[in-house]
Amino acid sequence: MVETQPSDVPLLAGISEESAALVTAGGVTDVPAGQVLAQAGDPGFGMFVVLDGTVVVERGDLHLDIERNGFFGELALLVPGSPRIARVRARTDARVLAIPREAFDQLLETEPSLARGLLRELAARLVQARTGH
């Protein structure tokens, strides 16, 4: 299997080398299948990008698979102090990149394309949640 690097992730494509260093400062973690990455109610400190594998976001009857190049936990960045709203666990063995709030805030200042990509994805998720498509 070819491992995905942060620069391969569409959301992060085209960012400067300096910004890429900020992104990777949060660290990459290998997560075994079944392991819980976040619980609803946990404090949110940042977002995660799935580099390999699949994680599932579980909230009530909603189960949303986030696969390679996808991300989760972004609400913690957009609404400071907000707790996690769902449980997230690895459906398969996975590699995730953590992006802490401080790094994300700096990225938004220097990389407007990141904000646009994030907004597009959030809008698509909202449409999917409301329409089922």
Language-model regions: role of each:
Residues 94-103:
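A short hydrophobic beta-strand segment most commonly corresponding to one strand
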Residues 1-33, 77-80:
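Cyclic nucleotide-binding regulatory module and flanking cytosolic helices
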Residues 5-9, 20, 39, 74, ...:
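Residues at structural and domain junctions
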Residues 8, 15-18, 83-85, 102-133:
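A small-molecule sensor/coupling module
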